[in-house]
Regions:
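Charged, low-complexity intrinsically disordered terminal segments
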Residues: 1-299
Length: 299
């Protein structure tokens, strides 16, 4: 980005640098025409929103803009919601998805995730919570509008999805550092950018990015994805038609959890929603403590 949004990001980064213990950095001068040669801009003359996450600290008021933006974007999608994320472990985000799945004419929701989180601890925290949430969402998906997929190479090797992207219809494009898990949306320091289409050119650009991402995952040309979406009106049907042998997207399969893994997931032991919950008793919190209130007692 360049222009006023770049200046705003610079101010944000300088402040965070000092909060992290760095020495103050002087503000640079605004340069004109600093866009790299040979790099075509996807969008020009658009308003860019900045959403932040900053945890509560003794000298800092918490900021949960990134989470609030996720919830608003999920609630506002009309036909299609496309998400790429390293994790899917936030109860609040899952609840927002569940509300859309309950609607008779809600949007399709496609989530791209890695097969498993990296490291030895993150799979225990993230994969188990994802399994519990996807199981619960599957029970709510009576209209069959939710799918999760994993990207794979032509040789069948899983590709680790590290992206943080949300595209709602051809109207909203969001990217940044926020993952769909409690730690990212409540405890970490994050920053996301988002644009909303206010003209046909911007809407076409947003759709082109979505179609290009799907084409990359499916090993086909973007024009094939665009044409198939136009024919079917469905992201899910498009993926199902185009995925096959070679580079492709494979559906998520809910794993069987051990009793310990299920307990860890249900109690959010390794992915608390805030500093206070790191020390809160397990009886007062858990993955589904508000889920049942949302369901209104439905089985």
């Amino acid at each position: 980005v360049e222009g006023p949004v770049a200046a705003a990001l610079g101010a944000l980064f300088r402040r965070r640098w000092v909060l992290a213990g760095g020495k103050p950095v002087a503000e640079g001068t605004m340069g004109e025409g600093c866009w790299p040669d040979g790099l075509a801009a996807d969008f020009t003359d658009v308003d860019v929103g900045i959403a932040r996450t900053e945890p509560e600290m003794p000298d800092q008021v918490p900021v949960h803009e990134s989470e609030a933006l996720f919830l608003a974007q999920i609630a506002g999608a009309k036909r299609h919601l496309y998400i790429e994320s390293q994790y899917f472990a936030s109860r609040k985000i899952a609840e927002a998805v569940a509300r859309r799945l309950d609607e008779a004419d809600g949007p399709e929701i496609v989530i791209i995730n890695p097969v498993t989180a990296q490291g030895w601890l993150e799979p225990i925290a993230m994969d188990t919570a994802r399994a519990r949430l996807m199981t619960a969402l599957g029970r709510r998906d009576g209209h069959q509008r939710l799918r999760m997929y994993h990207p794979h190479t032509a040789g069948g090797e899983a590709i680790y999805c590290h992206a943080k992207i949300l595209i709602a219809d051809d109207q909203v494009f969001r990217l940044g550092s926020s993952n769909v898990n409690n730690r990212s949306l409540r405890l970490d320091t994050e920053c996301d950018l988002a644009i909303r289409a206010r003209d046909a050119a911007t809407a076409a650009g947003i759709a082109a990015i979505r179609d290009g991402l799907l084409a990359e995952h499916l090993g086909v040309e973007p024009a094939v994805v665009t044409a198939t979406i136009a024919e079917t009106g469905s992201l899910i049907e498009t993926i199902e038609r185009l995925r096959g042998e070679g580079k492709t997207l494979k559906p998520y399969e809910v794993p069987d959890l051990t009793s310990v893994e299920a307990w860890l997931a249900d109690n959010e032991v390794l992915d608390p929603e805030g500093p206070d919950e790191m020390f809160e008793s397990f009886s007062k919190r858990g993955l589904f403590r508000r889920w049942h209130r949302l369901r209104g007692g439905r089985s």
